[in-house]
Structure formats: structure tokens, C-alpha cells
């Protein structure tokens, strides 16, 4: 395999006021030509909110619970990542061109950057939201290991950037709120990571109903088992270990790190938590969303 060019932690690039990984920002121009199909299904999340988990669940549903079919390729090929671009790897759009319908498509884009065709075609969306504290901790470790991001510096300085929306994909607060608003006018199934952790079978049943499919109970149980954190952490078709360490260095931090709710307590100091809570209350006031920060 040819050597992948040095990714060397380029600075974020702003598009319409939203910071993005440099390569992803460059990919947005070609997204203008993207045509959604009515039977596409979009998986949308802010980063580190259970994207790969729900992608694996949906691929299992689309493959009628056939585990072997779900090992046909890495998850980023089975569920193309719309805005993805990185040196030496096919772009998300290139992968999509070879993906047969009905397609599962992943994005982290805020609505301001989402191709209008997805809304025009009334494409169904499964959105997963996770509490901000766990997202911030997970994102910090992801920044450390995924070298397409700038250097995260210290946890304290990263947390400040997260609160200010100065991380890739911008503000968590805006992301979860605007997709919540969209769910009132567009076919969006809005799920919570914490609910999925608490009762995955119940949430998978919600997804099945939303996509208009039914599966035998034993198949649903198999999906619960196959998409458990332990199984996915050991599944090379789901855990991103097939990517070059030039892109993701698992020796720094695993892509599948802990997969729990409430891990923020091991990282936040009392002072950070107080500062975060005060800022959070201002940004989330009156939005109608409430998150559990532990189970």
C-alpha cells in the first residue's frame, strides 16, 4: 500500500462560521453535486455520541440480522461518511457512488452545512444525542488519537474550546437543539445515547418501527448482542483498527474507549464541573431537551 501523506494535525478551517477538520471542509464543495435518494437513511450525530453504534445497529437491521453480511467491510464503507475526506483514502462521496440502494449515510454536519437535497427529499434521519459532559471527555481522547484534528492541548483548555464551540463541527449545544427543532417538521427519530445504554432492545424496536421493518424477537436479541460495546470493541469491521495509524493512532487512545455513561466524573474537576454547569444552563435554557449525565 502506498504511503499515506503526513496528516500532521492541520488547524481547523471555518465554513459559514463553523470550524471543521481541514480535509472535511475541503470536501464540502463537492457535496453540492450530491443527490439524495428518497430511500436513503441519514444517521446524524454530533461526534462521539454513538454514531458507530447506531450505524452497526442499522446495518444489522438492513441485513436482517446476518452477522456475516455485516462483516463484509469496515463500517465506514458499509455506512459511508458523507463529508469524509483524508489523504490516501476514498472520500465519503466516492464510497457512496458504489453503495447500492437503500443507502445508510452518516454525517456530523450541522444543518447550516447539510446538503439541501437531504431535506428536499424528506430523507428519514436517525439522530443520536449524548450528554455534553461525556461527549466532551470522549471528544478530547478522540482528538488525541485522530491526527486529522489539531493538537487538543490540555484537558482544561480543550474543555474551554468545547464550551465555546471552537472544536470540529462547532457547538454541541447548537447541534443537539437544531436537530431537535427539525424533528418537529421532518422525519427525524431523535434518540438519546443514555436510553440506548439503559435498554438497547427498546431503542432498537423504536428504530425498526421508524424504518418500517419488522424482525423476529430472536433476531432483535442477536442485534443487541452483536452491537454491545464489548462485541464492537473487538470487531475490526466496527472499531476503526483497519485505518492507518497515520489517521487514527489506537496506541494513544482506542477509538472504542469505554462506551459508558457518567465517565465524565473521572475527568472533570469540581471547579470545571461548576463552570460547565453554569454555562450549560445559559445555553440550554428553554430548549425543551433534557439529558441524563449518569445512569
Swiss-Prot record:
Question: What is its quaternary makeup?
Answer: Homodimer.
Keyword Cytoplasm listed? The answer is: yes
The record places the active site at: 108
- Which reactions appear under catalytic activity for this entry? a phenol + 3'-phosphoadenylyl sulfate = an aryl sulfate + adenosine 3',5'-bisphosphate + H(+); 17beta-estradiol + 3'-phosphoadenylyl sulfate = 17beta-estradiol 3-sulfate + adenosine 3',5'-bisphosphate + H(+); 4-ethylphenol + 3'-phosphoadenylyl sulfate = 4-ethylphenyl sulfate + adenosine 3',5'-bisphosphate + H(+); 4-nitrophenol + 3'-phosphoadenylyl sulfate = 4-nitrophenyl sulfate + adenosine 3',5'-bisphosphate
The entry marks the following residues as binding 3'-phosphoadenylyl sulfate, namely 48-53, 130, 138, 193, 227-232, 255-259
Short name of one Pfam family for this protein? Sulfotransfer_1
Q: Which family does it belong to?
A: Belongs to the sulfotransferase 1 family.
Q: Specify the species.
A: Canis lupus familiaris
- Gene name as annotated: SULT1A1
Q: Under which name does UniProt file this protein?
A: Sulfotransferase 1A1
Question: What UniProt keywords apply to this chain's record, in alphabetical order?
Answer: Catecholamine metabolism, Cytoplasm, Lipid metabolism, Phosphoprotein, Steroid metabolism, Transferase
Amino acid at each position: 500500500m502506498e504511503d499515506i501523506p503526513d496528516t500532521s494535525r492541520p488547524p481547523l478551517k471555518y465554513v459559514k462560521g463553523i470550524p471543521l477538520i481541514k480535509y472535511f471542509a475541503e470536501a464540502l464543495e463537492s457535496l453540492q453535486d450530491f443527490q439524495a435518494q428518497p430511500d436513503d437513511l441519514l444517521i446524524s450525530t454530533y461526534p462521539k455520541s454513538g454514531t458507530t453504534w447506531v450505524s452497526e445497529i442499522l446495518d444489522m437491521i438492513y441485513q436482517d440480522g446476518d452477522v456475516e453480511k455485516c462483516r463484509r467491510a469496515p463500517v465506514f464503507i458499509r455506512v459511508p461518511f458523507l463529508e469524509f475526506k483524508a489523504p490516501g483514502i476514498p472520500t465519503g462521496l466516492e464510497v457512496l457512488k458504489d453503495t447500492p440502494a437503500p443507502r445508510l449515510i452518516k454525517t456530523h454536519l450541522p444543518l447550516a452545512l447539510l446538503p439541501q437535497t437531504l431535506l428536499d427529499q424528506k430523507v428519514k434521519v436517525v439522530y443520536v444525542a449524548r450528554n455534553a459532559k461525556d461527549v466532551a471527555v470522549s471528544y478530547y481522547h478522540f482528538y488525541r488519537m485522530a491526527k486529522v484534528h489539531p493538537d487538543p492541548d490540555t484537558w482544561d483548555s480543550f474543555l474551554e474550546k468545547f464550551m465555546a464551540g471552537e472544536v470540529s463541527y462547532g457547538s454541541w449545544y447548537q447541534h443537539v437543539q437544531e436537530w431537535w427543532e427539525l424533528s418537529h417538521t421532518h422525519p427525524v427519530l431523535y434518540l438519546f445515547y443514555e436510553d440506548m445504554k439503559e435498554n438497547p432492545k427498546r431503542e432498537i424496536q423504536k428504530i425498526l418501527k421508524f424504518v418500517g421493518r419488522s424482525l423476529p424477537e430472536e433476531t432483535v436479541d442477536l442485534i443487541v448482542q452483536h452491537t454491545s460495546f464489548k462485541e464492537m470493541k473487538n470487531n475490526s469491521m466496527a472499531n476503526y483498527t483497519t485505518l492507518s495509524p497515520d489517521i487514527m493512532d489506537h496506541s494513544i487512545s482506542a477509538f472504542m474507549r469505554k462506551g459508558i455513561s457518567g465517565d465524565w466524573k473521572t475527568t472533570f474537576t469540581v471547579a470545571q464541573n461548576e463552570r460547565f454547569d453554569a454555562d450549560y444552563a445559559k445555553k440550554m435554557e428553554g430548549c425543551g431537551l433534557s439529558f441524563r449525565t449518569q445512569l
